[in-house]
C-alpha cells in the first residue's frame, strides 16, 4: 500500500508543468533576427544611420550600417 501511495505522489509531482514565459529566449531570438551574415538586423523600418539591403521574410527589412554594405559594382 505504501509503494502505491509513493507511486501516485511521484506521478502527480512529475506531471506538474510549471508556468513559464511564452516565446523564445531573447538570445535565441537575437540570432534568428539577424541577416546578411549576422551583420544586419531584421526590422520593420531602418534607423537613420542604417540602409535597407534585402528582405527578411515577408514583412521585415534587413537593415545594415553603411560600412557593412557589400560592394555592388566594381569599376
From Swiss-Prot:
Record has Disulfide bond as a keyword: yes
InterPro entries xref list: Beta-defensin (IPR050544), Beta_defensin_dom (IPR025933)
Chief place of localization: secreted
Localization per record: Secreted
Cysteine-cysteine disulfides: 35-62, 42-56, 46-63
Pfam families membership: Defensin_beta_2
Extent of the signal sequence: 1-22
BP-aspect Gene Ontology terms: defense response to bacterium; innate immune response
Record's keyword terms, sorted: Antibiotic, Antimicrobial, Defensin, Disulfide bond, Secreted, Signal
GO cellular component: extracellular region
Function: Has antibacterial activity.
Family under the similarity heading: Belongs to the beta-defensin family.
Protein name: Beta-defensin 30
Native species: Mus musculus
